[in-house]
């Protein structure tokens, strides 16, 4: 099933390109590693469109429309071999000093022991230096459906704008 996800990612990117260019809002692209039960790790890739919602005295609150791709894992005793994707929407707060925090709700494509049902909740905390960010993210369905191991990831991000 792996060949399906690059095609879905391309379709999503092409569909989002006109609104992204029209709004000239920042776009974050990231890559990193995710871990789940017993530290089974894998590659992750992320993309997010972040139009400004409102400015505060010490930062900016942004809408976040994004996608996370989690590569399937081989040679594990858990059901983690299928690639999974989560498409999410939410909000992200970016302080002027670099602190970043966000939360969103999404839907998934693909099913594993770690990501096993909708909705999926995406929480983010990290730090941003101009165009570079280091973000810790957790994706989980909050035990609405079992199994629910979730994915916890560390992602290095580059901001385009």
Predicted regions and their residues:
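Cleavable N-terminal export/targeting peptides
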Residues: 1-24
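Short glycine/proline- and aromatic-enriched beta-strand/turn motifs that initiate or cap beta-hairpins
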Residues: 20-75, 87, 151-161
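Predominantly the C-terminal beta-signal and adjacent terminal strand-loop region
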Residues: 24-25, 117-161
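Short glycine-rich loop/turn motifs that provide flexible caps or phosphate-binding loops at active sites
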Residues: 29, 101, 105, 125
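Outer-membrane beta-barrel strand-turn architecture
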Residues: 51-59, 93-99, 126-131, 160
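Mid-chain, structured segments of secreted extracytoplasmic proteins
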Residues: 63-105
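A membrane-pore/channel beta-structure motif
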Residues: 95-99, 105-112, 134-137
